[in-house]
């Protein structure tokens, strides 16, 4: 009924469409995994049910809340309404400090305690790496 050229054209278009759909799917999956979405301590406190999935908690490191004990770091993240205690094992980023923004990735023990597996320190829009600042200062 249809000629050989029409069948080949249909197969070619079907393969292109399948490739485009697969590419879009893979890009969206990649973006979903890399988007840095986090919940504030207030959002954590308002949770009805705690799940066992890995989540991110973000806010400011409360002043005078950092306690370093050998390989563990304990600190408090606040959104100035509520607070959550964080326990992290490992080295913290260079930008990690009291009064600075931070995102902790890990698991909730309960609505007040969080075990972090990764710490991401945030910086403001004026941040400049020391090497760049030094290079610009010389000129």
Swiss-Prot record:
One GO cellular component from the entry?
A: plasma membrane
Record topology, Cytoplasmic segments: 1-9
- MF terms in GO: heme binding; metal ion binding
Residues binding heme? 123, 127
Q: Is Cell membrane tagged as a keyword?
A: yes
Which N-terminal residues, if any, form the signal peptide?
none
Q: Which residues are on the Periplasmic side of the membrane?
A: 31-139
Q: Which UniProt keywords apply?
A: Cell inner membrane, Cell membrane, Cytochrome c-type biogenesis, Heme, Iron, Membrane, Metal-binding, Signal-anchor, Transmembrane, Transmembrane helix
For this protein, the parts annotated as crossing the membrane are: 10-30
Q: What membrane topology is annotated for this entry?
A: Single-pass type II membrane protein
| InterPro entries in alphabetical order | CcmE, CcmE-like_sf, NA-bd_OB-fold
A GO term (biological process) for this protein? cytochrome complex assembly
Q: Which Pfam families match?
A: CcmE
Localization of this protein: Cell inner membrane
Coiled-coil region:
none
State the family it belongs to.
Belongs to the CcmE/CycJ family.
Role noted for this protein:
Heme chaperone required for the biogenesis of c-type cytochromes. Transiently binds heme delivered by CcmC and transfers the heme to apo-cytochromes in a process facilitated by CcmF and CcmH.
Q: Which NCBIfam families match?
A: PRK13254.1-1
- Protein name, per record: Cytochrome c-type biogenesis protein CcmE
Corresponding gene? ccmE
């Amino acid at each position: 009924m249809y000629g050989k050229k029409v069948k080949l054209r249909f197969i070619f278009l079907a393969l292109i469409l399948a490739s485009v759909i697969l590419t879009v799917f893979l890009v969206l999956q990649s973006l979903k995994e890399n988007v840095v979405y986090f919940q504030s301590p207030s959002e954590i406190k308002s949770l009805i049910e705690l799940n066992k999935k890995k989540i991110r908690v973000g806010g400011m490191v409360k002043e005078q809340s950092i306690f370093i004990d050998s390989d563990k770091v304990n600190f408090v993240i606040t959104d100035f309404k509520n607070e959550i205690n964080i326990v992290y094992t490992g080295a913290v980023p260079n930008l990690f400090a009291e009064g600075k923004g931070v995102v902790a990735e890990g698991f909730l023990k309960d609505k007040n305690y969080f075990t972090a597996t990764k710490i991401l320190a945030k910086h403001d829009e004026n941040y400049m790496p020391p090497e760049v600042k030094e290079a610009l200062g010389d000129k």
